């Protein structure tokens, strides 16, 4: 859970009564997240820098959750930067496309900003600069572009295919917005900065593209979890997922 509101969802609510036991995540322990504003500025700056130098920007994501927030951020950023209007943004996930229908259907569950925009005839999920990529075969990567593809840890699928294709070129860039598990390619790229990686075909590829890690984790940090527990005043606390 997260106590911090984002572009479309409300923060987690606090129970109105004090439970005897609260089972709560401890994913980040005593770590603190950057503010939403700082994260968004770092994210958009990294993406902008990559496409401005003529590169292709890969954003590996999970199909549901933070993907939708990142699309909203990019669409809003593109809207205020006319020089980027010719640079396409794609999300390449059939699951994400199905999720969009659910998000559009349940606008009433979103935050005040989204509901207000919808009430005035502006559905935030009708993007101006973001489009779905029906098939990888339809991707023209001869020019700068942004692709948001799953899976988020680069272990297989389109995100790994694009990474292997783009990683030798120093103009290109990888922006990692999510959590990565030890042993995955994503974790290795963030924590060990390898000079080469082994492709699915067994070939060793040079890693020349820029790598940026900007956490948009949906898990609460120490401050959020502590605030939640202080408000609940439980007799007992059980920590999980950490």
Predicted regions and their residues:
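Short, conserved secondary-structure transition motifs
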Residues: 65-66, 84-105
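Active-site metal-binding loops of divalent metal-dependent hydrolases
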Residues: 1, 26-28, 62-64, 94-95, ...
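A structural signal for short, well-ordered beta-strand segments and their strand-loop junctions
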Residues: 58-61, 89-92, 175-176, 239
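C-terminal regulatory/interaction regions
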Residues: 76-79, 124-242
